[in-house]
Amino acid sequence: MADLDDIKDGKDFGIGVPQQNPAFTLKGCGSLDWGMQSRLARIFNPKTNRTVMLAFDHGYFQGPTTGLERIDINIAPLFEYADVLMCTRGILRSIVPAAANRPVVLRASGANSILTDLSNEAVAVAMEDALRLNSCAVAAQVYIGTEHEHQSIKNIIQLVDQGIRYGMPTMAVTGVGKDMARDQRYFSLATRIAAEMGAQVIKTYYVDSGFERIAAGCPVPIVIAGGKKLPERDALEMCYQAIDQGASGVDMGRNIFQSEAPIAMLKAVHAVVHKNENAETAYKLFLHEKG
């Protein structure tokens, strides 16, 4: 320990220079605790406040669907090209190398399959385990307008309450019932309810008409789901339109890992999200990277 006689008086105190602490500018997140902001800053690039997430959590209800038969073979080579990985704790522990050094959004709801009612989910991960896995956020479905709406909202509330206690963001993922219309009115309702319950990030679907109203009416960042597999040019157009209309990023799965050139597709999506490239320019990049 330094002796008092060895301590030199400080001289450069910057007198007259106001103390600097740049504001956290991610939409709706400026008043969150430091730990939660720190995790969100790993998910959303602080230079753009946007993100490219790679979702490969589908097996929690679909099993080994096309493209996810072998995560170690099909998905692991993509890790370095994504900003964030979204997966289950089972896959994270068994296949994702800790040295991949990518922030993780951990799937935290489940307990059903494609053989049953998908809306009947429960919280499937303890917050302590999410912390143990060094997750940057937890994610759960919310099914507005379905038979199990109440339980899915309770799941979000539970994760939000526990997340606030530990500094862990919650991403609410808007599921859609079989008979629900995927339109602006529905997603405006679903995203706003999830945000009002305290979710710090919302994942939802892009719609061709009125998406800018969905994004404007949601007080926290929205990332869009990729949804079903589209031709690469169409998927890039969807990304561009979503970002242009207010989305803060994408969380894509099938449109990446079922692409004929997944790495090239990730690079093209990255160009749209972080460099504001239009779909045509991004598609040319895709073709170039595809070779």
Swiss-Prot record:
<comment type="function">
    <text>Involved in the degradation of phospho-AI-2, thereby terminating induction of the lsr operon and closing the AI-2 signaling cycle. Catalyzes the transfer of an acetyl moiety from 3-hydroxy-5-phosphonooxypentane-2,4-dione to CoA to form glycerone phosphate and acetyl-CoA.</text>
</comment>
<comment type="similarity">
    <text>Belongs to the DeoC/FbaB aldolase family.</text>
</comment>
<keyword id="KW-0963">Cytoplasm</keyword>
<dbReference type="InterPro" id="IPR013785">
    <property type="entry name" value="Aldolase_TIM"/>
</dbReference>
<keyword id="KW-0808">Transferase</keyword>
<dbReference type="GO" id="GO:0005737">
    <property type="term" value="C:cytoplasm"/>
</dbReference>
<protein>
    <recommendedName>
        <fullName>3-hydroxy-5-phosphonooxypentane-2,4-dione thiolase</fullName>
        <ecNumber>2.3.1.245</ecNumber>
    </recommendedName>
</protein>
<feature type="active site" description="Schiff-base intermediate with substrate">
    <location>
        <position position="203"/>
    </location>
</feature>
<dbReference type="InterPro" id="IPR002915">
    <property type="entry name" value="DeoC/FbaB/LacD_aldolase"/>
</dbReference>
<dbReference type="Pfam" id="PF01791">
    <property type="entry name" value="DeoC"/>
</dbReference>
<dbReference type="InterPro" id="IPR050456">
    <property type="entry name" value="DeoC/FbaB_aldolase"/>
</dbReference>
<dbReference type="GO" id="GO:0004332">
    <property type="term" value="F:fructose-bisphosphate aldolase activity"/>
</dbReference>
<comment type="subunit">
    <text>Homodecamer.</text>
</comment>
<keyword id="KW-0704">Schiff base</keyword>
<dbReference type="InterPro" id="IPR033673">
    <property type="entry name" value="LsrF"/>
</dbReference>
<dbReference type="InterPro" id="IPR041720">
    <property type="entry name" value="FbaB-like"/>
</dbReference>
<dbReference type="GO" id="GO:0016747">
    <property type="term" value="F:acyltransferase activity, transferring groups other than amino-acyl groups"/>
</dbReference>
